[in-house]
Regions:
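Short histidine-centered loop motifs in beta-beta connectors
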Residues: 125-148
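A structural signal for short beta-strand/turn segments enriched in small hydrophobics and glycine
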Residues: 90-92, 142-154
């Protein structure tokens, strides 16, 4: 862990660039999957999703719980129904909005992304957002979106254990042909091993608590 901490600390104070993303939500969320090795990020085993990140909202008295009590349904999770926001300016390339949300304990492996959208944010740079609520996506292919714009709601569609937001960046709009790129998030707040960092520009690894300023 100390090597990961050292690597991240080297990025503190890095200037924000046009390529940096905004976290796609409001509030405090936990990084469930993230990093550049399979032991901290299962997405590293899928070329298009390499460096992908999974976020779950936390709450409760400790601000570390994924749900209140023992969840029995998707609505018990803090992530459920939270707005999903555009991480950058761009153009919507594709949208899926009609997949059902899975009851807790079931998955849709046939449609792993569930309700999702792809945004072109730069040349050969496409942001993929997945697992949204059925019917909640408020944009369509061809729409121009602005950073922080509401796109839909966090759901439990696709190959999803419980409600969360999946984000990854790839070099083509085709999930089956793309190669993943490391998403860098600019000027965010991070809690790492109990320490607070404000306004940093970092890649994300599993185990961080993150929020926008």
């Amino acid at each position: 862990m100390k090597y990961i901490v050292t690597a991240l600390l080297l990025l503190v104070g890095c200037p924000v660039s046009a390529q940096d993303l905004r976290l796609p939500f409001n509030g405090r969320w936990f990084v469930m999957q993230g990093g550049d090795t399979p032991n901290v990020n299962q997405h590293m085993t899928v070329e298009a999703q390499a460096f992908g990140v999974d976020f779950a909202k936390v709450g409760g008295a400790s601000q570390r719980q994924l749900a209140l009590g023992t969840p029995t349904k998707v609505e018990d999770f803090f992530s459920w129904g939270e707005p999903v926001l555009a991480p950058a300016d761009g153009t919507v390339v594709s949208v899926v909005n009609d997949r059902p949300d899975n009851p807790l304990g079931t998955k849709d492996a046939e449609h792993p992304a569930g309700n999702c959208l792809v945004i072109r944010v730069a040349e050969e740079r496409f942001v993929y957002l997945a697992h949204m609520q059925r019917g909640s996506v408020s944009v369509k292919a061809g729409d121009t979106v602005k950073r922080s714009q509401r796109l839909g709601l966090c759901g439990n569609s696709g190959n999803c254990d419980f409600p969360h937001i999946h984000l990854h960046v790839q070099d083509t709009p085709d999930l089956n042909a793309g190669r993943g790129q490391n998403p860098i998030f600019g000027a965010i707040n991070v809690e790492l091993t109990g320490k607070q960092f404000t306004g940093v520009t970092w890649p994300l690894i599993r185990g961080l608590f993150v929020s926008n300023p």
